[in-house]
Amino acid sequence: MIDRLKKSISKTKRAERSRFKLKKLGSRPRLVFIKSNQYLSCQIIDDIQGVTLAYATTSEKTFTGEGKSKKDKGAAKVLGKLIAERGSQKGVKQVMLDRSGMIFHGRIAAFAEGAREAGLEF
């Protein structure tokens, strides 16, 4: 139990530390990646104005991923392309990736690759 609590606290501290650094730079919008047990979601947030510019999730009815699952690497890559398209419609080209304390590997790396392929710069 203590190990789980320590792991959770460590992840929260990593997320806060990275968000503090991103907000300190603050000139570009943040691209936030969120993993849940069933779905993946992301949003582009402008911290200066405090608004969400674009949002995408694998739980949308219009979402069609590469595989059967809505939370694997294939779905993450398609989600990255989708958020890049929605961001470009709002005029967003450059963002800062907020990993929420997670390491840049697996689904997050696939998500970033899909977003870069579709034209987002970070």
UniProtKB/Swiss-Prot annotation:
<comment type="subunit">
    <text>Part of the 50S ribosomal subunit; part of the 5S rRNA/L5/L18/L25 subcomplex. Contacts the 5S and 23S rRNAs.</text>
</comment>
<dbReference type="GO" id="GO:0022625">
    <property type="term" value="C:cytosolic large ribosomal subunit"/>
</dbReference>
<comment type="function">
    <text>This is one of the proteins that bind and probably mediate the attachment of the 5S RNA into the large ribosomal subunit, where it forms part of the central protuberance.</text>
</comment>
<keyword id="KW-0694">RNA-binding</keyword>
<keyword id="KW-0699">rRNA-binding</keyword>
<protein>
    <recommendedName>
        <fullName>Large ribosomal subunit protein uL18</fullName>
    </recommendedName>
</protein>
<dbReference type="Pfam" id="PF00861">
    <property type="entry name" value="Ribosomal_L18p"/>
</dbReference>
<comment type="similarity">
    <text>Belongs to the universal ribosomal protein uL18 family.</text>
</comment>
<dbReference type="InterPro" id="IPR005484">
    <property type="entry name" value="Ribosomal_uL18_bac/euk"/>
</dbReference>
<keyword id="KW-0687">Ribonucleoprotein</keyword>
<dbReference type="GO" id="GO:0006412">
    <property type="term" value="P:translation"/>
</dbReference>
<keyword id="KW-0689">Ribosomal protein</keyword>
<dbReference type="GO" id="GO:0003735">
    <property type="term" value="F:structural constituent of ribosome"/>
</dbReference>
<dbReference type="InterPro" id="IPR004389">
    <property type="entry name" value="Ribosomal_uL18_bac-type"/>
</dbReference>
<dbReference type="GO" id="GO:0008097">
    <property type="term" value="F:5S rRNA binding"/>
</dbReference>
